[in-house]
Amino acid sequence: MFVPKKSKYRKVFKGRIKGNTKGGSTLSFGDYGLKTIEAGRVQSKHIETVRRVISRTLKRSGKIWIRIFPDTPISKKPTDVRMGKGKGSVEFWVFKAKPGRVLFEISSDVPMHLAKLALEKAMAKLPVKCKFISNYS
C-alpha cells in the first residue's frame, strides 16, 4: 500500500475537488496512458489493485509508471461511537484526482491492443471515469 513516510499534518479538512488539473495532463514516460475525465478520490488500495491488474495482463512485459501518490489522509470514527470527542483516526490515504490527470502510463514495447486491454481492465477498478490515451493517436 502507498503511504507517505512523513506528513506535515496528521489530519486535514475534507475540502472539495474543483477545476481541472494544473499539471500532469500529458504522457511523460510511456506511450499509452490512463487519463481521468471526472474528479474523485483514488485510494492507495485502488492504485495497488490497478498496478497488479496491468502487470498481470501484460504478463510482466513492458514498464508501468504510476504518476500519482496518495498524500491526503482520510479520518473516520469507529462504529457505535457518539458524535463529538474529537476527530477520528486516519483510516486510509487518497489522491484527489482532478479531470485531465494522467494516472498510469505503459511503455511502447507492448502492442497497442494489449496496452488498451490492460488499461480498460484497470478502468473498471478505479472509482473515477477515465479514458485511454496514446502518443500514436
Swiss-Prot record:
CDD domains: Ribosomal_L16_L10e. Binds 23S rRNA and is also seen to make contacts with the A and possibly P site tRNAs. Belongs to the universal ribosomal protein uL16 family. Gene3D superfamilies: Ribosomal protein L10e/L16. This is Large ribosomal subunit protein uL16. The gene is rplP. GO terms for cellular component: cytosolic large ribosomal subunit. One of its GO terms (molecular function) is rRNA binding. PANTHER family: 50S/60S RIBOSOMAL PROTEIN L16, LARGE RIBOSOMAL SUBUNIT PROTEIN UL16M. It comes from Wolbachia sp. subsp. Brugia malayi (strain TRS). Keywords: Ribonucleoprotein, Ribosomal protein, RNA-binding, rRNA-binding, tRNA-binding. Part of the 50S ribosomal subunit. InterPro entries: Ribosomal_uL16, Ribosomal_uL16_bact-type, Ribosomal_uL16_CS, Ribosomal_uL16_dom, Ribosomal_uL16_sf. GO terms for biological process: translation. SUPFAM superfamilies: Ribosomal protein L16p/L10e. The keyword tRNA-binding applies.
